[in-house]
Amino acid sequence: MKNAVRDMVERMTGGNTKVAEICASAVADLEEGDVCRRLGEDELRILSEVSNVVHAAGDDTPAEDVMAPFVVSGNLLYTRRNWQYERNVAERIGRMSRNVSAGDVALPDDEFYSLLREEQRKTVAAMCKSQFSILTGGPGTGKTHTVARAVKFLKDANPDLRLALAAPTGKAAARMTESMSNAGVTAAPATTIHSLLGVRYDQVSFRHGRENPLPIDWLIVDEASMIGMPLMSNLLDALHDGCRLTLVGDVDQLASVERGHVFGDLCRMRGVSISRLLESTRFPPDGEIARIAGAVNGNNPAEVMSVLRAESGVVSYVDLSKTSSVAPAGWTGFAEMCRKRFGAFADSGDPKTALDRINDFRILCALRHGPYGVDRLNEFVRKILGRGCPEPMMITQNDRLQDVANGDIGVVMPDDPRRLHLPSVDGTRSIRLECLPATEPAFATTIHKSQGSEFNDVAIVLPPDGVSPLLTREILYTGITRTKGGVRLYASEASVEACCIKAVERVTGLIKPHS
C-alpha cells in the first residue's frame, strides 16, 4: 500500500519524491491505528507547494470542497477519507452535545431507583438531560444497572420511545442483551452495529445513513471503546437529528482495532456529558484485582509486583524469565493448571453443558504467534487434554447468512467434529464448519479478542523480554479485568514494567488544543 501511494503521488507531482514519501508514510501510519500524521515545519512547507495532492483545510472548509487525496489541517496530514470521517464525528458530536434539556431530573422514590448510589443517580440525570452522553467505568461499577434506570425513566415519560441496543461484536451484543434484561429493561435484543446499520453484501456500505436514518429515538451502544473512527462516523450518519445517543464502555480498556481512539478522545472532549462510575461491586477496592488494575493505570509497576508476589490465592505469578524453557511444558505448574481449570469443560458430555462451562477459564495472550502466543498455547492445551474432549472455537469473520460475528465462540464436540455448536435463545444451534468463513481454537485467545467477555478465572501470558510493542497499559488492564475470580500471570518483571509505563498513543485530531 505504501509503495502504491508513493508511486501515485510521484506521478501527480511530476516526480517529487519528498512529497511522495511524506504521503506514503502517512498511509503507513494508518496500520498502527493512527488517523493522521503529525508534521514538522519542513514537511508542512514541502506539502504547501502541491495543492493538487494536499488540500489545506481550515475549520470551516466544507467537506465537499476537498478533492485532493490528502488534507492538511493544522499540523496534521490526513487521507481525504479519514479527514472526512473525523470532521463528521466532531461536528455531529458537537451539535448533539449542545442539545441539553433545562431543569433538574427528579427520579421517583421507589425501589427501582432507591438502590442507586449517588454517582449513579447523577449519571441517570445526565443521560436523561443530554442528547449525547457517555458512561464509562470499570468492571462491576454498575454501568448496565445505571443505563437501565435511565431507560425506565424516559420510557415512563414517553411509552412510545423507540429504543435500540447495539455493540461492536456479536459476543458483546449477546452480553448486553442478557445484562439489560437482568436489569429490568424491556427492549429488542441488542445487535451488532453492522447489523443495525444494515451492512450491504459489498461489506463497505450500509443501508442506513444520512438519506435513510434509523427509525429510533435512542441508541445505546455498549463496549464503545472498540469502535473505530470509520464506524463511528457511519453510525452517527444513521441517526436522525433528534435521536439520542449514549456510549457505554471502559475508557481504560484497549482502543479499537480500527484506526482512531474515538471513545478515549470523546471522554476528554469539553462540552460532552461524561459520567464516570468509580465504585466497583465486583472487586473490593482493597482487593488484589482492584489494586493491580489501579497500579497498572497509575504506572506503578512496583505495586503490581508487590501484589503478585504476595501469592494471595486470588492472584498468582510465575516468572518466565527464570524458567529454563520457552515451551509451555517447562513453565511452572502450567500443564497442571490447564488440566485442572479446563477439567469440567473437558468432561462435558453434550454441547449445552460445554457452552455453559466455556467461560469458566481462559488463557489470554498479548501475542498471537511465537512461544508465548495463542497458536502455540492452543496446540499445547489440545495435546494435554487429548482428542476425546470438546474444543472451543472462535469465529474470526462476520457472516450475515449464518448469523455469526467475529468473536463469537462455540464448541466442537468429539463425536461430531464437523459441526460448531453455538448458544442461541432456545439453547444451542449448530453449523457445519465448512459453512463458516473462518474459525480458530479458543482455549487461548488474544487479550484483544477477550474484550467484552468475562471469565471465572484467567491466566495471562506476556512475553518475558519486555520489548514487544504490544505490551501496553491497556493490554494488561484489559486482561486482568476479564476475571470475576482469580488471575495467574505468566510474565516477567520486565514485561510488567513495560506494560505499566507505556500507554497506547494514536495520532488523531478529534481533540483540538482548545477542547
Language-model features and meaning:
Residues 252-393, 399-402, 413:
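Conserved helicase motor core of P-loop NTPases
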Residues 263, 457-515:
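Helicase C-terminal subdomain and adjacent C-terminal extension
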Residues 121-124, 128-312:
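ASCE P-loop NTPase helicase motor core
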Residues 103-120:
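N-terminal pre-Walker A segment at the start of P-loop NTPase domains
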Residues 43-104:
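Interdomain "pre-motor" coupling segment immediately N-terminal to P-loop NTPase/helicase cores
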Residues 400-408, 420, 467-471:
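Short, Lys/Arg- and Gly-enriched loop/turn segments at beta-strand edges
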Residues 1-43:
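Intrinsically disordered, low-complexity N-terminal extensions of AAA+/P-loop NTPases
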Residues 401-408, 446-456, 479:
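SF2 helicase motor core recognition
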